Each structure stands twice: as structure tokens, then as C-alpha cells.
Amino acid sequence: MIWILYNVLFFFGFLLMLPKFLLRMRRRGGYARNFTQRFGRYSPDLVRKLDEGRRIWVHAVSVGEVFVALKLMKDWRAIRPDLLFVLTTNTSTAHAIAEKQLDARDVLLYFPLDLPQIVHRVLDTLDPLALILVELELW
């Protein structure tokens, strides 16, 4: 029951906040270009790239965590060069930093919205061997 209530409240809360998000995206520019990733919608090229290897999903919430995640991924790649890393972030600033420093073999995405249909779609698409949460934020 609580899970259903959470999902209903999250959905309507998101709809209520959507105008604010859209205004922010318009002001910042470029932020909207990957907005569909929040819904688990990825370009065909990106989906093809995901088929290139065994995937480890690394989630870094913001800038500080991105630096930790990039170091972790680099060190792990030295041991397991066959792995493909999928790095997700929550903020546009963290995304921009990761974009500049991420290994070309890896994939950078925005973290999906916390709704069951979206999370299932992302898990089906990414099909990760493991998920590494650099820092977990539970609200």
C-alpha cells in the first residue's frame, strides 16, 4: 500500500514540478537535450553501444561523486578491460564534468525517474552485471 501511495504521489509531484523543470532547462540551455533519458528513452546509437560488452552501472549523484566514480572505473578497467561502464548522474553539472572525462568506451546517462515502469525499462535496456552506488541518497 505504501509503495502504491509513493508512486502515485511521485507521479503527481513530478507533474506539478514539470513547469519549473522546463523553465530551468530553457534557461540553462542544452539541459533538455538528454531529458528523455530520465524516462528510460535512449537513442538507437546508444542502445547499440550498450551491446558492446558486459555492463557495470555506476551511479554518481553529483559532482563530488562523479570524481570518485571516474577513479573507480579507471582502476577497475585496469583489471577488467572487457567491461563497459554506464555512468549515471542526477545533475547537469555532474553530467557535464563526466562528459569531459569519461572514457570513450563508456556510456553517460541521466539517472531515470523513480517510477516502476521507467526503472524496469532502464534495467531491461542496460541489463547490468552489477550496480555500484557511489553515494546513496534516500529521501
Which residues does each PLM region occupy?
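Short hydrophobic helices that act as membrane-entry/anchoring signals
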Residues: 2-25
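Active-site and donor-binding regions of nucleotide-sugar-utilizing enzymes
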Residues: 18-139
